[in-house]
């Protein structure tokens, strides 16, 4: 069973110790779990809701994720239909190298999406993310969950978006 749990004094060291394979480090763009946790604190302090969560499978920590709720207002998105709108953004998602290839990633991502679909921080039509252009596994996972690439690439990362009501089509991102 997959669970998403808050990070506290009892599990923070375990979150920090999670790691990916050496050949996957380029995919997380040097964004460590500790850095993400610090970013979450900063974002929450600035009034931008951030949820850093530990991923557990049968009471064993297997990964870490973080999503935020903010306005999609980066200059890269100016000509897009979702520009200026509130969205949930997947800030970080990783499964520890010891637990990869067992289907946990998809189950955990589905669990996170189910949480987001409850709109915990406010209304939104969209959830979006970036993934490294060479991360074929991530690309396939996100596509299987309804994410559509927008054609926007920043720092070797591909932007993809999903409409929370399931109605997004290629036309939305053209």
Region spans (language model):
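Short aromatic/hydrophobic contact patches that present stacked aromatics
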Residues: 92-94, 128-130, 161
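Conserved acetyl-CoA-binding loop-helix of GNAT-fold acetyltransferases
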Residues: 95, 101-115, 140, 144
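Short beta-strand element of the conserved SAM-dependent methyltransferase core
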Residues: 55, 160-162
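Conserved active-site alpha-helix within GNAT-family acetyltransferase domains
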Residues: 106, 132-151
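A cross-taxonomic marker for long C-terminal extensions/tails that follow the last structured domain
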Residues: 163-174
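Conserved SAM-binding loop
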Residues: 4, 101, 131
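Conserved beta-strand-loop-alpha-helix junction that forms the acyl-donor binding cleft
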Residues: 123-139, 155-158
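Acetyl-CoA-dependent GNAT
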Residues: 2, 6-98, 111, 115-121, ...
């Amino acid at each position: 069973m997959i669970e998403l749990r808050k990070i506290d004094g009892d599990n923070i060291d375990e979150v920090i110790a999670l790691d990916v394979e050496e050949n996957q480090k380029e995919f997380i763009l040097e964004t460590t779990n500790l850095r993400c946790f610090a970013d979450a604190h900063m974002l929450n302090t600035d009034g931008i809701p951030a949820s850093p969560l530990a991923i557990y499978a049968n009471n064993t920590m297997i990964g870490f994720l973080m999503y935020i709720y903010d306005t999609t207002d980066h200059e890269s998105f100016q000509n897009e239909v979702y520009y200026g709108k509130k969205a949930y953004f997947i800030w970080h998602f990783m499964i520890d190298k010891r637990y990869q290839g067992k289907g946990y990633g998809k189950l955990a991502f589905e669990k996170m999406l189910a949480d987001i679909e409850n709109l915990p921080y406010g209304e939104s039509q969209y959830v979006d993310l970036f993934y490294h252009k060479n991360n074929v596994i991530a690309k396939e996972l996100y596509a299987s969950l309804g994410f559509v690439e927008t054609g926007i690439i920043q720092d070797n990362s591909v932007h993809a978006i999903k409409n929370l009501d399931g109605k997004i089509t290629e036309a939305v991102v053209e």
